[in-house]
Amino acid sequence: TQKIYSPLNGKKISRVALLTGCVQRVISPEINEATIRLLNRHNVEVVVMPDIDCCGSLNHHLGKKEKAKLSFVKNIESWHEEYLLNGLDAIISNTSGCGTTLKDYGHIFKNDKEMKKKAKKISELTKDITEYLDENLKLDIKKNEEKKYKIAYHSACSMQHGQKIHDQPKELISKTGNEVLDIPDGHL
């Protein structure tokens, strides 16, 4: 069964699915836990689908096309059914490589008559956590007035090139009162 994490105050304003990822779930599960807490604190219900454990990109990058396609189809079908039955406002990825793959589902299945529409919908619903926070939530971020830091930020290649996300992560950091420094040649 799916795991549903409800807002603590019971005042749900949105419902999203979270991709927990095959690698992240094992190596850094605290990132998923923090994502769920953050969304819940801002009245967002989070659902984690039990049958979705990998976006499929690892097999895709290793050239294991059939295995990758099985993951893609399973994910698309599962999220699309959840979208139709219970509603989803977004599918959240907090790993840029996975997010890029999910956003590519529509392109990957553009010539597949059976999967085309569903894959396109899943791609449209997919948001990086920084996109979702910026576009959907009015975050009241407490500024650090005591000590300001200079924070060097380097966007992952899959974030800046694959998903075309440039400003949201830096804007979120800036809202804390700290200065964001771009790394020379960070676009490479």
What kind of region is each of these model predictions?
Residues 1-188:
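Iron-sulfur cluster-binding electron-transfer modules in prokaryotic oxidoreductases
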